[in-house]
Amino acid sequence: MMRKLSPGSKIVLASHNAGKLREFSTLLAESGITVISAAELDLPEPEETEETFTGNAAIKALAAARASGLPALADDSGFCVSALDNRPGVYSARWGGPTKDMQVAMERVHREMGDNPDQRAFFVAALCLAWPDGETRTVQGECHGTVVWPPRGDHGHGYDPMFVPEGESRTFAEMSEAEKNAVSHRGRALTAFLNTCLDTSTQKTERK
């Protein structure tokens, strides 16, 4: 039988990114999952050596689960631009240089796109849930849209200010957290994660 998390479980988010911690905590709170960050536990960040989002998510989740003794959830996400052959992709954070400055990263995307009329882009989020014994479960979500320049908005993080999702006129960074979560790659991956990895039988029993 596939192992699942019970409501009330505590998991480690295998990330030192405060923005991601806030986003995941909000998304998982309704399901009764308590999230603590790898930074709180002072866990090291493993090197991401895979060429896929799911591969890198698994590296991070397994490292955090084994180090903490708790189930761990890792996300590996990236920005894929059609005109750049879907780069920066898994190297999205590295495009910000040694300090991962996302303003630098966005300027590089804009510079490399040049006058290319193809403005299509999409975000990918892969989530991996790992247990200390090495068992893993992986899901993925995508959100398609277009690149805009100059960047707009003060919310969100990463490449959010230069991306407008399909059906919207605002960038991710111009949306509220709830609005973004409803359509984002991470929100879609979380929905798949909850459907796949959360044991809802307890909740159903409690409602009766």
UniProtKB/Swiss-Prot annotation:
Catalytic activity of the protein: XTP + H2O = XMP + diphosphate + H(+); dITP + H2O = dIMP + diphosphate + H(+); ITP + H2O = IMP + diphosphate + H(+)
Entry EC number(s): 3.6.1.66
BP terms from Gene Ontology: nucleotide metabolic process; purine nucleoside triphosphate catabolic process
Catalytic residue positions: 76 (proton acceptor)
Cross-referenced Gene3D superfamilies: 3.90.950.10
Coiled-coil segments: none
CDD domains in the cross-refs: HAM1 (cd00515)
Keywords in alphabetical order: Hydrolase, Magnesium, Metal-binding, Nucleotide metabolism, Nucleotide-binding
Residues that, per the record, bind Mg(2+): 47, 76
Pfam families hit by this protein: Ham1p_like (PF01725)
Record's GO cellular component terms: cytosol
Binding-site positions, substrate: 15-20, 77, 157-160, 180, 185-186
Note describing how the cofactor binds: Binds 1 Mg(2+) ion per subunit.
Cofactor: Mg(2+)
Family the entry assigns: Belongs to the HAM1 NTPase family.
Subunit details: Homodimer.
Designated name of the protein: dITP/XTP pyrophosphatase
Organism, scientific name: Gluconobacter oxydans (strain 621H) (Gluconobacter suboxydans)
